[in-house]
Amino acid sequence: GHGVEWTYSEGMLDEAHWPLEYPKCGGRRQSPIDLQMKKVQYNPSLRALNLTGYGLWHGEFPVTNNGHTVQISLPSTMSMTTSDGTQYLAKQMHFHWGGASSEISGSEHTVDGMRYVIEIHVVHYNSKYNSYEEAQKEPDGLAVLAALVEVKDYTENAYYSKFISHLEDIRYAGQSTVLRGLDIEDMLPGDLRYYYSYLGSLTTPPCTENVHWFVVADTVKLSKTQVEKLENSLLNHQNKTIQNDYRRTQPLNHRVVEANFMSRPHQEYTLASKLHFYLNNIDQTLEYLRRFIEQKIPKRKKQENWP
C-alpha cells in the first residue's frame, strides 16, 4: 500500500499531486469532464441501457465508510448490457457530494459548466473477466453508470430513506453496516433511456483509463434534509467531515462525447435557476481559492476557525 492516504484538498497527496503517486491520474483520458451540449455528438443508434437485477433484492448489501465516500457493495446478479451488447456486472455504488458551504454542490461531471448537488456512481466490470480485480487492469475492463442529483423543494425521496437513516452507523472511516432489501433501480433516475457516453477513467486514484462512462440525462430528486444528512454524517481518516469529495473536471483532449438525445430533456431555464447557477459558480471559485490559500499559508496552529 501507499504510505500517504490521497485526499481531495489537504496534505501531501491532494488531487493536484495525485499523478506523483499515481501516474495515470496525469493521463489524457481522465474523468470527470464537463459535458458541453454544443460539442456532444448525437448518436441515435445508441440504445437504452439494459439493467438486469436492479430491482428490489432481499439479500444483504454491505455498506462501508471508506474514508472518502460511502460505498454500497452490490451483488453480481445485477448487470448492465450496453448498446453494443457488452455485459457488465455490478460491483459497488458510491456517491460524491459537496457541502463545505451551504451552496457548494459536489457532482463530478458538470453539464455546460453547471455542477449538480450529488453524483451517484454504479461501478461495473466487463463480464468477460472473472472478477473486478482482474477487469480493473484490462483496457476494456470497467463501466460506470452515473446519475446526477437535484435538490429543490422536493419532498423526501422514500427510496433513499433506509440508506440515509443508516449513515449514522458508519460515521467513522472503516466502519461497515449491512442493509437488507434495497431497490437500486428506484435509487436511480426514473428515465434511464437517455445518456451521455464517453471513454474515461476512474475519478479517484489509481485513475486507470479503462472506464466506459454512461451519464444519465434524467436526474434523481432528493430533499434538502436528505442532502444535508449525506453531507454531514461521515468522517474521514482524519476525523473531519467528508465534504467536497469530488474531483475537478479534466481536459477532454480530442475525445468524443456521444448522446442519444438532441438537447437536455425538460430543463427549465428560469431566471432563478440561472441565478443559482452563477451564484454557485462564484461559490465554487471562492472555495477553490480558499483551498489554494490554505495550502500556501504556512501552518501556524490548527486552522479550525476557517469558514
From Swiss-Prot:
Alphabetical UniProt keywords: Disulfide bond, Glycoprotein, Lyase, Metal-binding, Secreted, Zinc
Record-annotated Alpha-carbonic anhydrase domain positions: 4-261
Record: glycosylation sites: N50, N239
One GO location term (cellular component): extracellular space
Pfam families reported for this sequence: Carb_anhydrase
EC number annotated for this UniProt entry: 4.2.1.1
Cofactor(s) of this protein: Zn(2+)
Active site residues of this protein: H68 (proton donor/acceptor)
Disulfide bridge map: C25-C207
Residue sites binding Zn(2+) per the record: H94, H96, H121
Domain of life: Eukaryota
Catalytic activity: hydrogencarbonate + H(+) = CO2 + H2O
Tissue: Major constituent of saliva.
Binding site for substrate: T203, T204
GO molecular function, one term: carbonate dehydratase activity
Subcellular location: Secreted
Record family assignment: Belongs to the alpha-carbonic anhydrase family.
Matching PANTHER family: CARBONIC ANHYDRASE, CARBONIC ANHYDRASE 6
Function per UniProt: Reversible hydration of carbon dioxide. Its role in saliva is unknown.
Protein name: Carbonic anhydrase 6
Species this chain originates from: Ovis aries (Sheep)
Organism taxonomic ancestry: Eukaryota, Metazoa, Chordata, Craniata, Vertebrata
